[in-house]
Curated annotation (Swiss-Prot):
Glycosylation sites: 232
InterPro entries cross-referenced by the UniProt entry: MetalloPept_cat_dom_sf, Peptidase_M12B
UniProt-recorded name of the protein: Venom metalloproteinase antarease-like TpachMP_B
Active-site residues, record numbering mapped to chain: 162
Source organism, top-level taxon: Eukaryota
Keywords: Calcium, Disulfide bond, Glycoprotein, Hydrolase, Metal-binding, Metalloprotease, Protease, Secreted, Toxin, Zinc
Domain Peptidase M12B positions: 4-232
Length: 235
């Protein structure tokens, strides 16, 4: 019998790493965070397990240039959400070895703010995460970035949120357009105001996923392109 196991490789930018006394402390923190991610993913009721393959904390001297290359010009306290995903794809496509090669999803944790600045706009739209939609298992595309600038594990919800984008779900209230999955049910029938993780996250529903999200993830997992998350249960 097959089990669904989504395997993650986590990298942390040097500013994130600096918050900790050692690389082991970074790994310990992320390990606890992933207990939270597992608890949230379980609300999909799809028997999905998350597995942390490993953590690489970048330091100033070892940090790949794609992070600094992704800052918003003129607003260097912000990472450009679109650019960081694009640059991550390029970097890990060219460094597709070790844990990066083994992982179903690669996530970068950063402490800088992340935002989107559209042409002609002066106000930055601040966001907590960005990822490549429906791209689990797709080498060179299976990436996301999440902001974690607190000492608490509340960012498990951001990692879970971006994971579910990578697993084929839009935000609640959005149709399937843009998912790259022609027959996906989308999530237009679940208003974002219901307050689930892919919506406005209210007190009542903010720690679980909507039925629409569940159906979207279930659909992607039924396709051959998601085969990397299936493994023999005895492993």
């Amino acid at each position: 019998d097959d089990c669904i196991v989504v395997e993650y490789y986590i990298v942390t930018d040097s500013r994130f790493t600096q918050r900790f006394d050692s690389d082991q402390a970074v790994t310990d923190y992320v390990t606890v965070m992933f207990t939270g991610v597992q608890n949230l993913i379980e609300t999909l009721n799809l028997d999905i397990k998350v597995r942390l393959l490993g953590v690489t904390p970048y330091h100033k001297e070892s940090e790949p240039s794609f992070i600094d290359d992704s800052l918003l010009p003129g607003h260097e306290t912000y990472v450009d959400a679109r650019k960081i995903v694009r640059n991550m794809k390029f970097y890990f496509c060219n460094h597709n070895t070790g844990l990066a090669k083994s992982a179903d999803i690669i996530i970068l944790l950063i402490t800088r703010k992340m935002g989107v600045l559209d042409p002609g706009d002066t106000d930055i739209s601040e966001i907590a995460g960005a990822s490549s939609i429906s791209s689990v298992c797709q080498r060179c595309n299976n990436v996301g970035a999440c902001v974690d600038n607190s000492d608490h594990n509340e960012r498990a919800d951001t990692v879970a949120h971006e994971s579910v984008h990578l697993l084929g779900s839009p935000h609640d209230g959005e149709g399937p357009n843009g998912l790259g999955l022609p027959n996906s049910p989308g999530a237009a029938n679940c208003p974002d105001s219901d307050g689930y993780i892919m919506g406005t996250r209210n007190e009542q529903n903010g720690k679980k996923f909507s039925e629409c999200t569940k159906q979207c993830v279930k659909y992607l997992l039924s396709l051959p392109r998601a085969s990397c998350v299936y493994e023999n249960c005895s492993k």
